[in-house]
């Protein structure tokens, strides 16, 4: 009987050690990938910063590809034609390419710029948005601790942070543009109780547009003193918010230049 109990104890101990080792490996692997992908994004950003400012297409670039693309994004676009823009917020870690996969929604939720599986994913535009035409572009990014990816949006819960970071730079492949923040709010996704901000892409009319902006202002964590009018172009940056199940933190901004 004692031997039987001893065997059970040994087996239990081995199982616990195995589970601990497996969990430790998973955690190590996760943070190792976060560091690796962060470094890769930094290299991509450096490539953009060092790109020529001249708007002409390189002689070796295919005429049918990238001919209207801004010079600093041409090389990246030729590497991955799913790229539709670039987003950055001065004073934060947000400085990333923005992707869109119309035929495979949410593909970049778990894939990097090279289309390889990645915990961090890559910021991406909702599949039913038209980059050139839609009234509102919904852009998703993971909330990664340490302010990585769209984790930096967490700081916008503080009005004092907003006061120092009121603008967002969002460039399409063909145009550089600045956006002014209209509202920062929290909601719950996939719930009848939440605000389905992701359903608003193209306004049916002025009333529809004003209704969306009004709801954003109603839910806002604080008053920015900024609003949007029918005809303005909007972006909505969306990331996870952990105070509620399926919580979302959303930053809405309008194009100003």
Segment roles from a protein language model:
Residues 20-257:
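Solvent-exposed, non-transmembrane regions of membrane-associated and secreted proteins
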